[in-house]
Amino acid sequence: VDSEDLIEAFKIYVEDDNEHLQGSVD
């Protein structure tokens, strides 16, 4: 597994998680 692929997947996961958190607060 390429480490850059992991980093990209992690960024997407974090961004998606942040959207859910902001949505629940709003």
From Swiss-Prot:
For this UniProt record, give its keywords in alphabetical order, as a comma-separated list.
Answer: Glycoprotein, Glycosidase, Hydrolase
* Domain of life, source organism: Eukaryota
GO molecular function term, any single one:
beta-N-acetylhexosaminidase activity
Record note on modification? Glycosylated.
Q: How does activity depend on pH?
A: Optimum pH is 5.0 with pNP-GlcNAc and 4.0 with pNP-GalNAc. Half maximal activity observed at pH 3.0 and 6.5 with pNP-GlcNAc and at pH 2.5 and 5.5 with pNP-GalNAc. Retains over 90% of its activity between pH 6.5-8.0 with pNP-GlcNAc, and between pH 6.0-7.5 with pNP-GalNAc.
Record-listed E.C. numbers = 3.2.1.52
Q: Which tissues show it?
A: Detected in dry seeds and cotyledons.
Q: So what does this thing catalyse?
A: Hydrolysis of terminal non-reducing N-acetyl-D-hexosamine residues in N-acetyl-beta-D-hexosaminides
How is it regulated at the activity level? Inhibited by AgNO(3) at a concentration of 0.1 mM. Strongly inhibited by CdCl(2), ZnCl(2) and FeCl(3) and moderately by CoCl(2), CuSO(4) and NiCl(2) at 10 mM concentration. CaCl(2), MgCl(2), MnSO(4) and KI also have a slight inhibitory effect of 20%-25% at 10 mM concentration. Activated to a small extent by MgCl(2) at 0.1 mM concentration but inhibited with increasing concentration. Not affected by carbohydrates such as fucose, galactose and glucose but displays a slight decrease in activity up to 25% with lactose, alpha-mannose and N-acetyl-galactosamine (GalNAc).
Q: How does activity depend on temperature?
A: Optimum temperature is 50 degrees Celsius toward pNP-GlcNAc and 60 degrees Celsius toward pNP-GalNAc. Displays activity higher than 50% between 35-70 degrees Celsius. Stable under 30 degrees Celsius.
Its annotated function is as follows: Has hexosaminidase activity. Active with both p-nitrophenyl-beta-D-N-acetylglucosamine (pNP-GlcNAc) and p-nitrophenyl-beta-D-N-acetylgalactosamine (pNP-GalNAc). Not active toward p-nitrophenyl-beta-D-N,N'-diacetylchitobiose (pNP-(GlcNAc)2) or p-nitrophenyl-beta-D-N,N',N''-triacetylchitobiose (pNP-(GlcNAc)3). Removes terminal GlcNAc and may be involved in storage protein degradation.
Descriptive protein name: Beta-hexosaminidase
